[in-house]
């Protein structure tokens, strides 16, 4: 592992990891508190009964969120105005997972831009100095912040602890206005955080879509569109039993009932026609039932 800070760039990629860097998430809303640590903004995130993240078959919960300025990574050898670092703790032991998204100065806006801007402004108003804390009084979800786009992956240290890193590239940076970036730089100071890492890999597919985490199903597979992947499904042992009452609401069940009724009607009609035909061909005598 190199002692130099890793540079997030396509020119540094050793290979693709579409098959071995599977990232799935379904983050819930949180009413967070923020603390100004002088060199970063630290945010709490509400815990949930179901881990919101699965990375390479391991389940993770959100530990905390940090906002720094400038970015702790370089992107094509250039620092970005800021970066959000989402720290995850493994549920069953293992190394932590960090998900990082850089900020860029832009007049464009997104839902992530609005959330980050609101957080920065609230901290600037209510916790502008080192050591200050504030309740944000806003609900937000990382679901609206983490892009469903390709990302880079490496394994490296953070504060002396080995971790898996997912880092979104410059193209996926969260746009913030120059005013918001200036506000951020006024309430926290730049601090060089070392991010040495090993080989850099690239997941061109992005996070897995369509998972229903929390319904007792966890899927460790590759992103949608990967034709060479096998999908393994692990069912929660505590999932509820099948509800037979749902059968009667099923469109398939209703279609089957309609077909059966239609067949019975056709049988009755043909039987009636047969009796009427025999009546006409036997001089008006109806056949006798024995």
Language-model regions: role of each:
Residues 1-290:
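Alpha-carbonic anhydrase
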């Amino acid at each position: 592992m190199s002692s130099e800070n890793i540079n997030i760039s396509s020119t540094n990629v050793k290979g693709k990891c579409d098959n071995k860097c599977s990232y799935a998430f379904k983050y819930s809303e949180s009413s967070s508190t923020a603390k100004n640590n002088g060199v970063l903004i630290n945010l709490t995130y509400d815990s949930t009964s179901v881990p919101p993240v699965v990375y390479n078959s391991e389940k993770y919960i959100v530990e905390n969120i940090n906002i720094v300025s400038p970015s702790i990574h370089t992107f094509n050898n250039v620092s970005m105005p800021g970066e959000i670092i989402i720290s995850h703790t493994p549920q069953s032991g293992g190394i932590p997972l960090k998900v990082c998204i850089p900020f860029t100065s832009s007049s464009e806006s997104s839902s992530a831009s609005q959330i980050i801007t609101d957080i920065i402004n609230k901290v600037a108003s209510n916790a502008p100095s080192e050591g200050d804390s504030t309740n944000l009084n806003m609900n937000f979800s990382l679901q609206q912040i983490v892009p469903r786009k390709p990302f880079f992956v490496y394994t490296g240290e953070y504060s002396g602890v080995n971790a898996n890193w997912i880092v979104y590239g410059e193209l996926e940076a969260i746009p913030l206005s120059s005013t918001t970036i200036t506000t951020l730089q006024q309430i926290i100071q730049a601090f060089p955080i070392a991010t040495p890492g090993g080989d850099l890999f690239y997941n061109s597919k992005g996070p897995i879509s369509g998972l229903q985490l929390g319904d007792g199903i966890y899927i460790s597979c590759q992103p949608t569109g990967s034709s060479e992947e096998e999908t393994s499904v692990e069912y929660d042992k505590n999932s509820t039993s099948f509800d037979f009452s749902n059968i009667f609401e099923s469109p398939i069940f209703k279609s089957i009932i309609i077909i059966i009724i239609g067949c019975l009607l056709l049988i009755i009609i043909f039987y009636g026609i047969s009796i009427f035909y025999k009546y006409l061909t036997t001089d008006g005598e109806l056949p006798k039932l024995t």
